Amino acid sequence: MTKKPGGPGKNRAINMLKRGLPRVFPLVGVKRVVMSLLDGRGPVRFVLALITFFKFTALAPTKALLGRWRAVEKSVAMKHLTSFKRELGTLIDAVNKRGKKQNKRGGNESSIMWLASLAIVIACAGAMKLSNFQGKLLMTINNTDIADVIVIPTSKGENRCWVRAIDVGYMCEDTITYECPKLAVGNDPEDVDCWCDNQEVYVQYGRCTRTRHSKRSRRSVSVQTHGESSLVNKKEAWLDSTKATRYLMKTENWIIRNPGYAFLAAALGWMLGSNSGQRVVFTILLLLVAPAYSFNCLGMGNRDFIEGASGATWVDLVLEGDSCLTIMANDKPTLDVRMINIEASQLAEVRSYCYHASVTDISTVARCPTTGEAHNEKRADSSYVCKQGFTDRGWGNGCGLFGKGSIDTCAKFSCTSKAIGRTIQPENIKYEVGVFVHGTTTSENHGNYSAQVGASQAAKFTVTPNAPSITLKLGDYGEVTLDCEPRSGLNTEAFYVMTVGSKSFLVHREWFHDLSLPWTSPSSTAWRNRELLMEFEEAHATKQSVVALGSQEGGLHQALAGAIVVEYSSSVKLTSGHLKCRLKMDKLALKGTTYGMCTEKFSFAKNPADTGHGTVVIELTYSGSDGPCKIPIVSVASLNDMTPVGRLVTVNPFVATSSSNSKVLVEMEPPFGDSYIVVGRGDKQINHHWYKAGSTLGKAFSTTLKGAQRLAALGDTAWDFGSIGGVFNSIGKAVHQVFGGAFRTLFGGMSWITQGLMGALLLWMGVNARDRSIALAFLATGGVLVFLATNVHADTGCAIDITRKEMRCGSGIFVHNDVEAWVDRYKYLPETPRSLAKIVHKAHQEGVCGVRSVTRLEHQMWESVRDELNVLLKENAVDLSVVVNKPVGRYRSAPKRLSMTQEKFEMGWKAWGKSILFAPELANSTFVVDGPETKECPDERRAWNSMQIEDFGFGITSTRVWLKIREENTDECDGAIIGTAVKGHVAVHSDLSYWIESRLNDTWKLERAVFGEVKSCTWPETHTLWGDGVEESELIIPHTIAGPRSKHNRREGYKTQNQGPWDENGIVLDFDYCPGTKVTITEDCGKRGPSIRTTTDSGKLITDWCCRSCSLPPLRFRTENGCWYGMEIRPVRHDETTLVRSQVDAFNGEMIDPFSAGPSGDVSGHPGGPSQEVDGQIDDSCGFGGPTCADAWGHHLH
């Protein structure tokens, strides 16, 4: 009886518990067993046997099988594997016995075995070679030898060796040598891939393969990023992506700091666009272009025009790479002066870096524990790099004792690719300059240099530091002389030319020397720091592999992002450089001034062509034969009105030959808009309509931008900021000098009230105009005028008007007026008070107790932000207050510097509002700004000269100047507010503190100097006139208080005024008599000493003064407290106790005046004791028993 499923199994019709095995085909059963074993199921012995089978056949076991192998307990696995080992030993013995029985048989089989053995020996002889290494047998193998046992016959019998290395390739330079230890019977190999059974031998093989490169390390060398080059040049930097980001940040800052201009640009962009998309694009473009007028504009135009004044005899030119200057002066032919090439040759090799190395001939010597230290004989070879270490040794790798054994590995280093650094020497820089006359040039000769030289219309010359002057003969045009002063714009001591592969770069010297790569010097062949491009891998018992790093060329190229790319073969063409030349035109003359006018007809050989520089080139054909004759050509606004407009670039054009149909090229500059080029006279007159796009207003702005660009590019190199001299009022000069010149060029002669009224008039006309485009033009122009008239606008860069004694940084005027009072409209501000507060906190933690201001404007900045800084410090739980004290005397220097930080303090709106109304309480710790030196905060613990000008901004009442923390540690004054110029017989060094004026009267000499305050920075050499070969002892204003190292800072009869009254206020240095006094020159006068006031403590006037060899009128200092004389001028026989002396010593350290006995010397009469005379001054500084005069002060005398 059957039941439904679910009941007990025994009662079912089919009993599942007693069901028999199914009938299965035998092969299917075997397959199932094998598959279960492959899946890791089954008896352990079967699993281990299957794994052993896979090992012997070099097949990869399945993942499941390996998983089961890892899961087997150690004791169980060891038991089965030991039994396998016994079975294998039994099989080996059986084979050995079988071999002996067969040897006894003799006959034909013996002959076959002998031949087989001979073949094996011949094959081994062809593949394996035997030699000696460090007193032991060395076998050299290839990749075919590792498949079988290597048998080496020895005196002790056959030595069988097994090599299981996986890096065996074919023989090449990349070889490795190491020891195969002897393993006793029953010991398994451990941490070795080569072993023998009779005696140890060395194995050597090559590691090269035919399918892939040799093994190399995955590690790379860390190369510090080069960063953006500080050089101003016309070539793009390598992989430079920083400028775009930096410019976007600059645009953002400009919008925030100049909201009025940003609003105006947005309004103009909105009016210019006809739809929303265009308006957005125009607005973005205007906002991106606008900051270019304010700071750090680079990239010069190819051509600049300089129009000279009548009677000019010379002009100073500043030529840049690939630039051209067109010089026009009355009654002189027009000249083109072109910088053709700047080239440096004979570069001296400094150092070579290896960026791709190869490692060959690796050898390892190993020793067992207690057998001594391993020593590789290749250590004696300097081309090898060696490394010693220790490895685990024992029975499994040939040693009788377990422990640490010594190992010594050597590998040969060779450089595959290297980067070479070379230095440029100033005397090897050559400047190639061409001078071309705008004469009667035919179209065939135009651009043909050889033909123009043959016609004496061009000349080319080379300027070097050893040959800076040259006179050029220009035929009938006379001659020109050029006195040049090469200024490469490249500090050759700060840059190297580095060649990496096929590319060369101009790199910073410090970066080059800090590269972490193997290097060698030109005089040596040995590489230093070779281990940087090698990697010693983990040492095994007797073997250690050494690999080389891959090529570091890619890393070097990436690190060089921002460096300037140059072309180098045997010489290097420089793209950063300037040549300042004085072009003397006194012997230059116009040719053809006496020729008559051409009477026949002209025709245009070709249509007039635009040169791209605002000028037009006209090629004319003259049909007459009455040459040479002058060409009647003019540009007019209308054919009904023949009044000339525009100007001729080719002065006095003429036809040079009498042959008919001769062709002549003439260049002229037409006005903006519509005009007519008229050639000829009467009924033979021809004309051509010409339209020049643009406007006078736009031209003023574009030329201003070019001047700003040139000034920014010349910056640190050119002291004259452009072309000065006899053509001070030239167009090019005005462009070079002033950044905000467009507004002043057009409306500078009007008062701001007139400018505002004119703007209002234009706005009114725009509102009432019917034509939409005209209305928009009036509204835009009027809006610009009103806005500019009511704002003080400024840019980085300063211009000097010597006649008006005026210095302009943008339009923020810094005037020295007739009553000799300083009026400034500048306000210094920190980049952000939040970051400055964090910088102060960080400096205080580093032991800086305070700050010394460099100038009065910096002191005023600290005063203005003091309360805000203190609120920020308090809000961020910093127990520190900034205290600003009144400065005493001159602004002194200090040794420390504030350091930059990216962190900022935060402040809420509530605290900010409270800071406007209430000053915060004084904290327990203070950060002192200026004031007298105290024990709590001596000058040794103060910071100084930590800030520099970042940008100029705009304001209603003052020009705002933003300061940022300096990245470098320097004593130089900030060059952003320094202006230097020469005009005629006057030279000026000036900044926002000093006005130093020199005049030429037979010789150049200091005339006067006015000081807003006295500071302690040094005047930068890059902004110094005539600074070659100046001795500091001759500088009247000491260089330690920002006196320029210039020959303009000298006057005959006077030495450095290091003990002048520099701590006084309102100092004016000039050469005249103090009121009510007289000065006589006599040999009986006293020696130099500290400056003395002409009135005593009680106010009594000292009338009689003398000097030994000074020049008259005498040097005097006018201050708020009275009149002082220079150090050479002494009172005649007066009571010393009532004299008021200067207590200043402007020398560094504890130096005493080289021309006097120091502050303690006598001030009248003859000095006592041994003395010497220096330039007519009695000096007894040698009378103190110290060093000799020559030893002590020889470097001050000349």
UniProtKB/Swiss-Prot annotation:
Propeptide residue interval(s): 106-127
Any one GO molecular function term: protein dimerization activity
Annotated stretches, region: Interaction with host EXOC1: 2-15
Chain segments annotated as transmembrane: 110-130, 254-274, 280-294, 747-767, 774-794
PTM entry text: Genome polyprotein: Specific enzymatic cleavages in vivo yield mature proteins. Cleavages in the lumen of endoplasmic reticulum are performed by host signal peptidase, whereas cleavages in the cytoplasmic side are performed by serine protease NS3. Signal cleavage at the 2K-4B site requires a prior NS3 protease-mediated cleavage at the 4A-2K site.
Keyword list, A-Z: Capsid protein, Clathrin-mediated endocytosis of virus by host, Cleavage on pair of basic residues, Disulfide bond, Fusion of virus membrane with host endosomal membrane, Fusion of virus membrane with host membrane, Glycoprotein, Host endoplasmic reticulum, Host membrane, Host-virus interaction, Membrane, Secreted, Transmembrane, Transmembrane helix, Viral attachment to host cell, Viral envelope protein, Viral penetration into host cytoplasm, Virion, Virus endocytosis by host, Virus entry into host cell
Start and end residues of each stretch annotated as Fusion peptide: 392-405
Stored Pfam families: Flavi_capsid, Flavi_E_stem, Flavi_glycop_C, Flavi_glycoprot, Flavi_M, Flavi_NS1, Flavi_propep
Keyword Transmembrane helix applies: yes
InterPro entries tied to this protein: Env_glycoprot_M_flavivir (IPR000069), Env_glycoprot_M_sf_flavivir (IPR038302), Flav_gly_cen_dom_subdom1 (IPR013755), Flavi_capsidC (IPR001122), Flavi_capsidC_sf (IPR037172), Flavi_E_Ig-like (IPR027287), Flavi_E_Stem/Anchor_dom (IPR026470), Flavi_E_Stem/Anchor_dom_sf (IPR038345)
Site features described as Cleavage, chain residue numbers: R105, G106, A127, M128, R219, S220, S294, F295, A794, D795
Keyword presence, Metal-binding: no
GO annotation terms (biological process): clathrin-dependent endocytosis of virus by host cell; fusion of virus membrane with host endosome membrane; viral translational frameshifting; virion attachment to host cell
Annotated segments matching region Hydrophobic: 37-72
Glycosylated residues (UniProt): N142, N448, N924, N1001
Region annotated Disordered, chain positions: 1151-1178
Entry's Gene Ontology cellular component terms: extracellular region; host cell endoplasmic reticulum membrane; membrane; viral capsid; viral envelope; virion membrane
Disulphide bond pairs: C297-C324, C354-C410, C354-C415, C368-C399, C386-C410, C386-C415, C484-C581, C598-C629, C798-C809, C849-C937, C973-C1017, C1074-C1123, C1085-C1106, C1107-C1110
Domain statement: The transmembrane domains of the small envelope protein M and envelope protein E contain an endoplasmic reticulum retention signal.
Protein's recorded name: Structural polyprotein
Protein species of origin: Japanese encephalitis virus (strain M28) (JEV)
Lineage of producing organism: Viruses, Riboviria, Orthornavirae, Kitrinoviricota, Flasuviricetes
